[in-house]
Amino acid sequence: VESGWLTKPIVATRSVMRPDDEGLRRAAEILNASERVTILGGVGVQGAHDALVRLAGTLNAPVVHALRGKEFIEYDNPYDVGMTGLLGFASGYKAIKEADTLLMLGTDFPYQQFYPEGARIVQVDVRGRNLGRRTPIDLGLVGTVADTLEALQPLLTQKPSREHLDRSLRHYAKTRKTMDGLAVNDRDKSPIRPEYVAGLANRLASDDAVFTVDVGSPVVWAARYLEMNGRRRLVGSFNHGTMACALPHAIGAQTAFPGRQVVALAGDGGLTMLFGELITLLQNKLPVKVIVFNNSSLNFVELEMKAAGIVNFGTDLVNPDFGAVGRALGAFGRRVEHPAELEQALTDAFAHDGPAIVDVVTARQELSIPPAISVEQAKGFSLYAIRTIMAGRADELLDLVTTNVSRRLLD
């Protein structure tokens, strides 16, 4: 180009986006006057981890994260009390419900039933349209979380009491212990607990692994058992809830980061929707590791039907041996039906120089119970039980009870 403008380097600058001084003063006034502050953070906290931890220390505030904030909030955070929402922990739910002030940072958390009643709410978001969109708020601040917290921090006074924080931390420790107690080899019984699969994947994967997760039950186990450390990534269709996203997301992640380990936690329903993309792994020599949660069902749909009091129908899946399919394509492939074989199978798959498919037969009736169950949901489960028996399918109900009650009593 004769003008030469395309040859000139682009000099990037960093913009600062924060509320005005009056907005910051009002936020500080509310937070300083509160006795039980809880912080709810989302994906907007990316790049503001240290500022968030410093703020939580000043306010003695437990920090709860929404799903999309998990990878940016929970690591190296002594104030973390887990996640809230349908996939979350009882500790996160309770820390929010017991707050007299909720500080929302970079989150458009949609579930109104998980917000506190009667608490004051301050919301910070770079997108002004998100302010007050999900719940009534007392103060909305437009700005990035990083810039806003940097300007807000000097206006805050150190809270003398840790009562609310320590109570929330104790509850989280108890909840975490209970959850981790489910991610075990269940006395070598088959089918395998999905919690155990996710727990092993977490332990065996590399420190900078990129995890991609299918919508449905795999995202539940990923949210509860994958540990983020500031280097790992967690990718999924967390806004739109699109099925079959784990494999294509993994293809994209592996292409973008060829030197990193990419692990796809796929549901059997999701994987079969885009089965042909397994060939893409071979054709493009992408060493993605695919772990299939094979429960022969659209598992999360079944859970929603149970909660609505509907007897399951149209959710059965007749699956092939996914490990054999992988081998037929030229990839590493293994099927695991017994928990004692799982760790070695995952170890071998992760060490394989190329794409790998591990087909894990998991418990169909394992319930991903939310942190709080409404009266309507409890009524729905009761109706499901009655209607299932009346339909002559009492064996399904027995399997449900055995999987979720008996095993927990024995552990």
Which residues make up each language-model segment?
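Glycine-rich, acidic loop regions that bind phosphate or pyrophosphate groups
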Residues: 15, 69-170, 346, 350
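Conserved thiamine diphosphate
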Residues: 98-99, 148, 154, 305-345
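Glycine/aspartate-rich loop-and-adjacent alpha/beta segment that forms the canonical ThDP
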Residues: 1-17, 113, 345-411
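Conformationally flexible catalytic loops at phosphate/diphosphate-handling active centers
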Residues: 1-31, 180, 184
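Thiamine diphosphate
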Residues: 98-110, 220-298
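Active-site diphosphate/adenylate-binding microenvironment
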Residues: 173-248, 253, 259
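Glycine-rich phosphate/diphosphate-binding loops that line cofactor/substrate pockets in enzymes
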Residues: 23-37, 96-98, 200-209, 254-259, ...
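Glycine-rich ThDP/TPP pyrophosphate-binding loop and its adjacent helix/strand module
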Residues: 19-26, 32-33, 319, 330-357, ...
